[in-house]
Amino acid sequence: LQLAFISVISSLAGGSLIGIFSLSAIKPVRWLARAYVDFSRGTPLLVQIFMIYFGLPAFFQELGFSFLLNRLLAGVITFSLNSTAYIAGIVRAGIQSIEVGQSEAARSLGLNSLQTMRHLIFPQALRRMIPPLGNEFISLLKDTSLVAVIGFAELFRKGQLIVAENYRAFEIYAAVAVIYLCLTLVCSQAISRLEKWMKWRGV
């Protein structure tokens, strides 16, 4: 849970920026943002974990710098970068769902592009983004099981360690699956309540 929450908070900020950059009128900015999204979404998450945990220290070692990433930090970096790409797509779609006429009306009132995005477009788009953002968080929560491959002691890894001690694989992995199911159901309910609250408040 710690890994998922830290990653989703950082990826919300990064994904919002990349999503806005992917709609930029400046071509190099738009191309870079979309290239980042394509790379992150087009490569396996497991490969990205190995790139960060094993590849990044090796790369810097070639440059003469020696350091090691701890497992939690490697997981946070990987999941944040990966989730940022998916959230960027959600943000981009949310912004594009707002009628173009609203931006034109804002400009006629003297608002610049930044003010229009901050005060008019993004608040409206945010409400439409809540369901897909919730789905992304749930996917991220389940994907954290992958960091077991680098030995990080999250839920799935702890299940593996217990199985290694008592060899009751079916019961242990079934219990792990039920815990993941409970976590995702709780998250789904929380997201649903947030969506209803935003509608009630007229956000």
Predicted stretch roles:
Residues 1-203:
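Transmembrane alpha-helices and adjacent helix-loop boundaries
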